[in-house]
Amino acid sequence: MNYDTSVFKKNLHELNIDLSDNQVNQFLTYYEMLIDKNKVMNLTAITDFDEVVEKHFIDSLALIKIINLDQQLSILDLGTGAGFPGIPLKIAFPKLKVILADSLNKRLVFLDEVISSLDLKNISTVHGRAEDLARMNLYRENFDLCVSRAVANLSTLSEYCIPFVKVGGQFISYKSAECNKEVDNARHAISLLGGKVKEIQKFEIGDSGRAFVSILKEKSSPKKYPRKAGVPSKMPL
């Protein structure tokens, strides 16, 4: 099927991202696989091509606004869902080493199919809850960067994500532009976990106000965090 990629390329140009024809085709294949699988599995409420481009692909890639992604960073995408932002980041920035984590295995089966179809390297999936994975030596404090577009309170997200990050690394949360109060309410939790709010960068994609909340990991997270499965969401720090 032919797609009008003019809006996609315009948005890429505004982010100073230059993709090869092969990379653009990888995005198109990803879109087709997403829409096809969405017929039998709830992956996205957005299915129109230009909307998926803007609200999923470009929103994911906008991370370039706050960090240089053209380098060999190890990235954990926690609560990846349909693969955002991890797969768009991997397509556009092949040097990245990416792990996609989710608690729902059938999503990861789909993402493994995408990874195989797009012939992506140095990207894999892991099934489990953040509270359990963060206690495993294989993952704890092992990533340069943890990212999440998951819809959750920042205090809860911080308890999920910060323990995965190396000291000196960052946790970056994708939020709406109206996040200042949420960030202020999360500062205590962030500090307990060894982090510090480094930057809040606001921007617009189409008619949506968006923000990146960048949290720098200054010291090792206490071993008692994250707490047992279910506790961080029910009783935020």
Feature names for model-found ranges:
Residues 150-151, 176, 219:
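Short glycine-/small-residue-rich Rossmann-like dinucleotide-binding loops
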